[in-house]
């Protein structure tokens, strides 16, 4: 059965970051959990850790094994919620469509779900059920966004941070990291007027934006440019801070920390001349489009139901897959016997007559058996039901 073990939504970032997984380690964790689960996909973002898995083990045992493999202290279990079956499937659908995001309808989660699925595929940790579920979830998320046209009012932590900086008339930026979030931050900054943008990365060659207002820096160079900056937006995947209090000049800054674990040293939060927002505070910033997005999303919620039903229908069909395989194997054996007969007799018989005889013999195998079953079912009082099925099979 498909199950879910996930961090609760209302946890503070200080707690969430204790369980964060570095992006490049997610595949390794998938493989570790596959040792105790039949199949597994880990969805890890700045706002969530969700482990989707399939297992026949009892709840207590599998949760303890997952915690052990992840290196988590079981005493922190109270920070997690668990569900299975319908509830787990519905939850993933809601996540994909943006209903479960701290920033309602945010447009990054679908890409993150696809990345989680691709990682599981690459590491061979997803089996048939999770493969089918994630394929339908991704398709559902795309259709939901297309029909609801949420792209007309896009929202993400990146857009909220940049818009907030605009409202405060900040024009001199420094962005840390140029991954999915960092590149999105830069895109939003570039979409409007600004004075200067410093992009701090480990590999300077990764940034190819051509704009005289942009300067690409290494992490070793960043400190020399702090005095020229009004706003910092940090979104690296580093497991440790990249903005340290001892390195910051004693002057006013506005800092948006979009990372989990946080990129900004905790003592910086105590500086009274620095306005700093972590990912939770960014999610709470008033957004004029929130009510409108919610109305649009609720009006299109039925799209999820269609894909949930499709998944349940697929599950039902899987119950008879072994019988379908047996039917196909039986058909192959019937074909093989008649082909062998043809090979052995084609030199001594009229081929047209031989082929006609073998084709008729092949059809008789199924027709005669169907007649036998129909007679048996008629005697048992189930003839009408059997006949209705046989008509669907043999009559158009």
Swiss-Prot record:
Domain of life: Bacteria
InterPro entries according to UniProt: 4pyrrol_synth_GluRdtase, 4pyrrol_synth_GluRdtase_dimer, 4pyrrol_synth_GluRdtase_N, GluRdtase_CS, GluRdtase_N_sf, NAD(P)-bd_dom_sf, Shikm_DH/Glu-tRNA_Rdtase
Sample GO molecular function, one term: NADP binding
Residues annotated to bind NADP(+): 177-182
GO biological process: protoporphyrinogen IX biosynthetic process from glutamate
Residues carrying the site annotation Important for activity: 91
Assembly and binders: Homodimer.
Note from the entry: During catalysis, the active site Cys acts as a nucleophile attacking the alpha-carbonyl group of tRNA-bound glutamate with the formation of a thioester intermediate between enzyme and glutamate, and the concomitant release of tRNA(Glu). The thioester intermediate is finally reduced by direct hydride transfer from NADPH, to form the product GSA.
Protein name: Glutamyl-tRNA reductase
Organism: Clostridium acetobutylicum (strain ATCC 824 / DSM 792 / JCM 1419 / IAM 19013 / LMG 5710 / NBRC 13948 / NRRL B-527 / VKM B-1787 / 2291 / W)
Gene: hemA
């Amino acid at each position: 059965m498909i199950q879910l073990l996930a961090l609760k939504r209302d946890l503070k970032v200080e707690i969430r970051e204790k369980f964060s997984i570095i992006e490049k380690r997610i595949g390794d964790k998938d493989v570790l959990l596959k040792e105790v689960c039949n199949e597994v996909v880990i969805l890890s973002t700045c706002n969530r850790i969700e482990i989707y898995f399939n297992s026949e083990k009892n709840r207590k045992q599998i949760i303890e094994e997952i915690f052990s493999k992840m290196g988590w202290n079981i005493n922190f279990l109270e920070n997690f919620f668990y569900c299975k079956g319908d509830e787990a499937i519905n939850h993933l659908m809601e996540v994909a469509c943006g209903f479960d995001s701290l920033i309602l309808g945010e447009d990054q989660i679908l890409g993150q779900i696809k990345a989680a699925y691709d990682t599981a595929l690459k590491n061979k940790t997803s089996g048939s059920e999770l493969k089918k579920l994630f394929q339908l979830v991704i398709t559902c998320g795309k259709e939901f966004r297309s029909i609801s046209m949420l792209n007309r009012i896009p929202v993400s932590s990146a857009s909220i941070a940049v818009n907030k900086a605009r409202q405060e008339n900040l024009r001199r930026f420094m962005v840390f990291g140029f991954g999915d979030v960092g590149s999105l931050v830069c895109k939003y900054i570039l979409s409007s007027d600004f004075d200067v943008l410093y992009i701090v990365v480990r590999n300077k060659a990764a940034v190819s934006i051509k704009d005289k207002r942009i300067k690409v820096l290494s992490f070793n160079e960043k400190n020399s440019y702090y005095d020229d900056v009004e706003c910092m937006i940090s979104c690296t995947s580093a497991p440790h801070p990249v903005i340290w209090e001892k390195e910051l000049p004693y002057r006013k800054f506005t800092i948006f920390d979009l990372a989990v674990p946080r990129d900004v040293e905790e003592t910086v939060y105590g500086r009274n001349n620095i306005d700093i927002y972590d990912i939770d505070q960014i999610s709470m910033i008033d957004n004029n489009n929130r009510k409108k997005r919610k109305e649009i999303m609720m009006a299109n919620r039925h799209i999820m139901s269609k894909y949930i039903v499709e998944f349940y229908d697929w599950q039902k069909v899987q119950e008879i897959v072994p019988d379908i395989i047996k039917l196909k194997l039986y058909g192959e054996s019937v074909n093989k016997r008649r082909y062998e007969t043809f090979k052995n007799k084609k030199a001594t018989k009229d081929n047209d007559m031989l082929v006609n005889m073998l084709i008729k013999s092949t059809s008789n195998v199924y027709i005669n058996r169907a007649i036998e079953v129909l007679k048996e079912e008629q005697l048992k009082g189930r003839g009408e039901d059997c006949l209705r099925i046989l008509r669907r099979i043999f009559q158009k």
